[in-house]
Amino acid sequence: MSRSTSTELQQELPASKEVPPDPTSIASSETASGSKPPSTEFTPRAILVLVGSFLVTFCSVGFTNAFGVFQTYYQEAFLSDKSSSDISWIGSFNIFCMFGCTFISGYLTDRYGPRLLICFGSLVMVFALFMLSLSTEYYQIFLTQAFLFGVGISFVLLPAMATVSLYFAKSRSLAMGIIVSGSSLGGVIWPIALDRLFNEVSFGWTVRIAAFIMLPLLGLACLAIRRPAEFANRPKPKADFSCVKNPVMIFLAIGLFLIFLGLFSPFFYVTSYMISLGKDSNLAFYMVSVVNASSLFGRILPGLIADRVGNYNVLFMVAVFSGLVACCWTKATSVGGIVVFSLAYGLASGAVISLQGPCAAQTVQREQFGVAMGVVMTFLSIAGLVGTPINGQILIPYGYLGLSLFSGLVMLLGSVFILLARLKIKTGLLVKA
């Protein structure tokens, strides 16, 4: 071997053993894959993906946010022989499937891309609604609305969120807030539309009309959402679940699990709370829309701030604020007080929901965005499954004060774990993290 050849080999060896960047840093999520993210984030292609993902959340989580209307209808007409707890399991299991299957859809997104998964999930969602429109028994409603529709959501929601994270690096939290705000808009529109339709047409045609509305919207999402060109020709990555050992990811998942145990209590019970005070039932119905309308801004504005001061910093602050507001729930006894509570809680809780994705994506390399979000959402699925029944069991003996304190305190406890995750990234209190 010549001297020049050996010298070249010696120069190449260190490069092959280069240590990868720390995935827990903010910068690593943008550069750890070895390629830079798009230089211009708000390109026509990126905006198209943003719009498609917005439509996904509007049709999926936004429709799920209207379950309170279904709960009331089932109790009064369709499933009057079933208890409130039995009916609430439909909504709880729907949330469990919606988040629980994301561990699978997240891995498949990283490996095969979002388009086929979103097309599959869209077909499952529409099929589930058509089957729901034909259902007359409790088990049929459970299989279609709770199980099948929830599984369909898991195959459209996470691929959309993970793909948006690939397009946006510096403005990731803002972008995520924009697409998640689609669920807030859906939470405003779907309850009003369903309530009107239930009063004017049959249950079957109400659900079928909802399916016909979703069909073109999800079709547009299937056409719009695709990975950046730089990922199109890359070899399919092997399964990499190393992020589950990351202490930051562990603290984040535990914290969000605790927060989500109490997060949706005001969404589900603010209407019945207002009616229990003797207020107008028609006005009480619109409180759910007030909470969702406020969360529309809560999912966008904090994301804009988080891109500048850090995702974990903002998530910790809004989690604490959500817990404090929830603890003050029963202090609102007038119509004006309940409206103010609904606005404040919607603003704070909306930020918690929109920042879970950016916080998860921040801890891993770009090729693992789907898996990381799937890990977090799997924890949320368990909270969604047991959270509503726990709330119902607390409400019976302890009333709305007990429900308020449980929701607020469990969210405050969850914020402690968010703080631990934040300090694991950077110990300084006044630094971006």
Swiss-Prot record:
Function noted in UniProt: Efflux pump that may be involved in the secretion of agnestins, dihydroxy-xanthone metabolites.
A matching Pfam family: MFS_1
Gene: AgnL12
GO molecular function: transmembrane transporter activity
Biased composition, class Polar residues, residue ranges: 1-10, 25-40
Keyword Transport assigned: yes
Membrane topology: Multi-pass membrane protein
Keyword Transmembrane in record: yes
Name under which the protein is recorded: Agnestins efflux protein AgnL12
Gene Ontology cellular component terms for the protein in this record: plasma membrane
InterPro entries found in the cross-reference section: MFS, MFS_dom, MFS_trans_sf, Proton-linked_MCT
Cell compartment(s), UniProt: Cell membrane
Region of interest (Disordered), ranges: 1-40
Organism: Paecilomyces divaricatus
Coiled-coil annotated spans: none
Keywords: Cell membrane, Membrane, Transmembrane, Transmembrane helix, Transport
Family (UniProt): Belongs to the major facilitator superfamily. Monocarboxylate porter (TC 2.A.1.13) family.
Segments passing through the bilayer: 47-67, 87-107, 116-136, 141-161, 174-194, 205-225, 248-268, 285-305, 309-329, 335-355, 370-390, 401-421
Gene3D superfamilies attached to this UniProt entry: MFS general substrate transporter like domains
Domain of life per record: Eukaryota
